[in-house]
Amino acid sequence: MANKDFLKIIKKQRSKSKKKKFQGTLLEYLDIIQEDPSTVQLAHRRLYDVINNKGCKTVDIDDDGYRGIFNGDKIRTYDYFKEEFFGMELIINKLMRYMKSAALKGEESRQVLLLMGPVGAGKSALTEHVKRALELAEPAYHLDGCPIREEPLHLIPRSLRPEFEKILGVKIEGDLCPICRHRLINDFNGEYEKFPVKQSSFSQRGRRGIATVPPMDANSQDVSVLIGTEDISKLDLYPEDDPRVLSLNGAFNVGNRGIVEFVEVFKNEIEFLHTMLTATQEKRVPSPGKNDMIYFDGVILSHCNESEWNRFKGEHTNEAIHDTVVQLKTTYCLELDQEIKIYQKILKRSDFKAHIAPHTIKVASMFSIMSRVKKSGKCDVLTKMKIYNGEEVIEKGRVKNIDINDLREEHRE
């Protein structure tokens, strides 16, 4: 009986995973776009939509002490983050403002988002959560057999693009990669309407649309990690400038139309990061060997510690890369109620079964926060913690009025 139950579960999952995905030609894909122009999305728009569509709301600052915490600023909370991150509302709001501007093709779409802050402030966890969001997105349409899963509309000749854009109601950006251009000419006689198009989902493990670049020392750094390599076994068969020798398996190739993450980005030699300049400002990356530049559409996320950032920006020779970076500072949680939720989340996911005495978590949270804030000339540390938590501080029967912004500016915690 148990075997039948397991088999039923397996078959149910398999039927879901084998949901029919589109396979057709460019002509059929054009019909789909005509019915729904939102099918065509750039990377920032796709990522912003999948997070925003999970639900969001504007916090009522008159409730629950939010007016004290946020000083009357309008704050939006996003359902996608609310069960994972606590006390990071301001940081997440800045992240989503960046994403929205980039989705609308603002200057942010040509910049690198850098999460910078102390160890344990949630930089890596936030980046991982954003990457997981992309795996929830609808499968993307792309050229069948293309190593960088590029947008099928790249097949449209530039001379015809204004006419197609008017009919379809979308903007066509980008050019064919060298491999697909070679296939179009040699396999399809230039008849781009017959080029096959398919759908596939985003997957970090499958290296489809999500790439991660770990920090490397000077001896092991190789630009091929970013832009791919030439297949040496094919150099005996084809000339060096033949697209068929290309193996486009670098991070910018894998992360095209998705996300490229740089882990501890400034632990790398600065020369290794020069590809970022063309990837952001020109939306192109070099191809291996002697081929043309390759169009790149992707969200570049990176993170580092504060000391590494200070060392990087202190070097005047790094100005070019510095100008392409949007810095988002992550900080430790300074709100008592949110710190308690963090501890409760950790305990809930652990295997600890020991009884915890009443108020233990609250006292531990108070200790953590008071160890993070600095002494102020306006109040003691305990009072400061209460103000950061949005509480009214009553002293000698009167409410003690201390501006939270004055406390923040005093030491810039």
Give the role of each language-model region.
Residues P37-E413:
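Conserved ASCE/P-loop NTPase catalytic core
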Residues M1-T58, G117-G120:
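N-terminal accessory segments that target, anchor, or regulate ATP-driven/P-loop NTPase machines
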